[in-house]
Amino acid sequence: SITSNCMIVNLQLGVWTGHRLDKAASKKVTDDAGAEDDAARVNKHLVPKEALKAISNAQGQIRLHFYDRTLPWKDNGDRILTRVMFQRFIEEHGALKEKFNDAVIDFLKNEYPVVVQKAEFRMGELFKRDDYPTPRELKDRFYANLDIDAVTEAKDFRVSLDKADREQVKSDIEAAMQ
């Protein structure tokens, strides 16, 4: 049955964007333009896009792997994975997560301190030191977590599918893993 041959997986990814709304600059822009207060917003890019590129690429690889190797189950992001494919999936996910974590560590140790040091010049009058979290504060903003649960919803029609339909679901999942 699906309850004994499959599991539910859900991926949560988080990345600090390096963007920050500047209310004072937004007010200045609208005042200078003679516009209403809600006519414009100034969103500062605290770090150059290039600085987060390795992290963004690693995050994209994790997401792509997750969607390639699983099938939709619920609208909340839950996806289904066969137990047969689980070990391979976890090994691949682990390798991708390691690359992601390595990119985060490299950014926090090597790139971020340099970016912050250059920010006063780069940002001009928009620079505010308080906009820049410490590396320790930033660390928790980057994550790639995988929740794994059993298929336990006895009321769910997919759990009580006949053998042919269960085999089709299993086949679809395994084909997604190819």
Where are the language model's segments positioned?
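A contiguous, surface-oriented mixed alpha/beta subdomain in the mid-to-C-terminal portion of proteins
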Residues: 156-178
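Leu/Val/Ala/Ile-rich N-terminal alpha-helices, chiefly Sec-type signal peptides and the beginnings
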Residues: 1-134
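Acidic, low-complexity proline/glycine-rich segments
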Residues: 132-163
